[in-house]
A protein has these predicted regions:
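Short beta-strand/loop motif that positions the catalytic acidic residue
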Residues: 78, 84-86
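Accessory cap/linker subdomain of secreted extracellular hydrolases
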Residues: 1-74
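Catalytic active-site module of serine/aspartate enzymes centered on a nucleophile-bearing elbow/loop
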Residues: 103, 110-150
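Conserved alpha/beta-hydrolase "acid-adjacent" motif
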Residues: 87-93, 115
Length: 150
């Protein structure tokens, strides 16, 4: 079987542009321009310092390869049993619509690093990222175990 674990439900470039939608128009334009080049398979050499974390030269080959895929199209092609475990209800629904026979579950209060976090506040979320004492969410493990054992 295949398990989609907090996977994107739409292309990565759409997600990046959405995440930066609150930035000034010039930044949004730059991001779209960089994304357009990467989607075309072309690396970008003049990345502004403020966007280096996202688009530094060492990560561009990865982004180029990732941008080739639409998760909805990929998951629709799968023929084996599929389990969709999701944090974002929006992405879960997109993936579920692509493969209605898939088993899917929203994991309440789990963030994208698979830890329990009851807050959507970014500072609270980030505190869980670096805390090695926080375990992986228990519901996640139980759901995966049931899927694998069937």
């Amino acid at each position: 079987g295949f398990i989609s674990l907090a996977g994107a439900g739409r292309p990565a470039y759409d997600i990046i542009e959405e995440q930066l939608a609150g930035q000034p128009a010039e930044v949004q334009y730059l991001v779209k321009s960089i994304n357009d080049s990467l989607k075309a398979g072309k690396e970008v050499s003049n990345i502004p310092m403020g966007l280096m974390a996202l688009f530094r030269p060492s990560v561009q080959p990865y982004l180029i390869s990732w941008y080739r895929y639409n998760p909805q199209e990929v998951i629709a092609k799968l023929r084996q049993p599929v389990l969709i475990l999701q944090v974002s209800e929006e992405d879960a629904k997109l993936l579920e619509q692509s493969l209605p026979k898939a088993q899917f579950q929203i994991l309440k209060d789990m963030n994208h690093v698979l830890k329990t976090c009851e807050s959507v506040d970014m500072q609270v979320q980030q505190a869980t990222y670096a805390n090695p004492d926080l375990p992986v969410q228990e519901d996640l493990l139980i759901t995966i175990e049931k899927f694998v054992k069937r």
